[in-house]
């Protein structure tokens, strides 16, 4: 009999090895953010073609040194990659595949932990769920960023581990799983300020289900939840330079909200901006002429407009929020539009097409169709909620609460990725994509389990009936 766990992990490992290790190596091009992580390790891409190409090789030189002021769990992961590189590097340069190995190992660890959760279900359902998870999460949209230094990556990987460990604690009640469940949320939340809000949902889940999370006592989970909330607050408050939030605020304000406003002067006033900012409309924060290269301008702008004020603006102007969300989702309905190959591969700036079927399907349905994307998400969430309520008696205690926290996290990432910035939208939506696919996967599992259980019940009920008819 085939061992589904070994087959699944080996299949996932083979896909990662083919994509991340074998030439031509696939990754996700730097948009300028890598230095926030790797500058402290004296690394810089040898060619460094922003957006268009990845760098397989990074030079290690003192003049590359820069400490960015950002806090992220990607930094210790990069340190592990640097140590690994020291063991295998022949020329003293850094090989990008080392970070791919570190990220890939975490992904495969999540896969290894996931499969036993299906041990008690029907064999056909188990293999179907493994195949579907492989199809979704080994897609190029997720795999290419494993060979990168983006700070979203640990949030994605440790979120997967958090979800898997929660289900393992519910199902198996092992101490090691409980300890990992206490650790992984912190590593996910501490990856990037944008994703720190997820800590509140996870903390709520730990408090609400503390009674069923064995063998750790309730007080341990309450303490973990409190510490997780404090970590989330610290990440929002101190994990990046004080004026860095002005950049995404600038982008969404002047590139998305104001260009679509029918009365720009009134909209600027509602946002707390005066007419002097009219010249910024249509500009990107990181490009010349935006004014953002002037620290004084940034400080004045952030004094006038904050995320809190933006949230109030959206609440007062739901039509603007809706239009911004739809416009953003229209751009998000595809994999990252960055180059995936090193320039030495001889390709023009291009995206890999291998193992990209799931991305292609979503791109065909959702790209430039933001309303369809939003309706699909709302429909999926509604279906998931209905299935949870219908099936809750057959589910382990705590799963119903976890399901609704998952929905809440999905809406949180939807809002963060669509309403708070207007640049690199598919990359910023990585966790929203992951949660979208997670909810879809859960819907398939609940539907298959329910259908199989009803089929068995009908079969069992039919057997005595036939026996009664044919009895002498």
Kindly label every feature range from the protein language model.
Residues 2-55, 62, 227-239:
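Transmembrane signal-anchor helices characteristic of membrane glycosylation enzymes that use polyprenol
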Residues 55-97:
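Short hydrophobic/aromatic helix or loop-helix immediately within or flanking a transmembrane segment
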Residues 36-66, 239-348:
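Membrane-proximal stem/loop segments at transmembrane-domain junctions that anchor or position
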Residues 162-180:
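Membrane-interface transmembrane helices that cradle and orient dolichyl/undecaprenyl
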Residues 101-123, 161:
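Transmembrane-helix motifs of polytopic, lipid-linked glycan transferases
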Residues 178-193, 228:
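Membrane-interface alpha helices of multi-pass inner-membrane proteins
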Residues 96, 131-156:
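Aromatic- and kink-enriched transmembrane "portal" helix at the membrane-lumen/periplasm boundary
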Residues 91-106, 324-406:
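Membrane-interface anchor segments at the N-terminal boundary of transmembrane helices
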